[in-house]
Amino acid sequence: MRMENIYEYIARLQSEGKWQESFGVIRAGLKDNYNDYELYFALGEYYLKDNIDKAYLCYENALFYCDNKDDRAYISGVMSEISSCGIKVKPLSIVIVSYNSKDVMKACIKSIRINNISSSYEIVVVDNASTDGVTEWLESQNDITLIKNQDNKGFGAACNQGIKASSPDYDIFLLNNDTVVSPNAIFWMRMGLYENDRVGATSCMSNNGGFQNITEVFDSVSEYIYYATKNNIPEYYPYENKVWLAGFAVIIKRDVLDQIGLLDLRYGKG
């Protein structure tokens, strides 16, 4: 007699209404294999009963990791069906301020591209009159909207320029250029953003995020990335409510931004 595989086991648990048990199995599976698209699809099934937006994001992440043509078509069909029911999820406009530091910027952009499905975001970079060649590199990238300032406008003003240049129906992700986006980091930030209607913005943990620091210390970027693959997984209580967030990586709902307006330039630091 053939043994049940993990996906069949999860499906059986869900069909029997054992949702929390299925969540635990999905969590354990993603801790071992962070890019298993079938587990993200199963996670979407878990959320579908309570939160269609989070379910959609899970299916989108499943599509990103899926390398099977037939399964990709099936996942896309599920996403289209959910979209027709009315979802609030918006793509991201990733706004980055640039001032020199070409290699740092290249690493940041690369980390966005390799860890996120291209249909889920756009990149807007505002360059504050750099002189080290980063402007020319940015100009050569066909997936970046570039705003070139003739002088250094400062961080806040440049962020506002980027927000104004973003697609009007996209959520805004303000991201420092010295960040490296780890696997599933943006996915889980967006999951938090659509936890409920009361959430207006989300941020994340970092090795250098002030009060949002992780406690572990490693010697290389690759070690931090590995740490992220083991920790950017489903959790029962993954989010903390905050009245303010560290500014190195913040996603703001478009609806909220439309209500509160652009960054207040009286406050100089991000």
What are these regions (language model features)?
Residues 60, 64-114:
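N-proximal low-complexity "stem/linker" segments adjacent to membrane-targeting elements
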Residues 111, 127-135, 151:
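A conserved acidic beta->alpha catalytic loop
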Residues 120-129, 147-149:
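Short beta-strand/loop segment that forms part of the nucleotide-sugar
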Residues 149-166:
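Glycine-rich, basic loop-to-helix element that forms the pyrophosphate-binding segment
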Residues 169-180:
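Short beta-strand-to-loop acidic/aromatic patch adjacent to the donor-nucleotide binding site
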Residues 180-218:
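Conserved donor NDP-sugar-binding/catalytic core segment of glycosyltransferases
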Residues 208, 227-255:
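A recurrent flexible, glycine/aromatic-enriched loop bordering the glycosyltransferase active site
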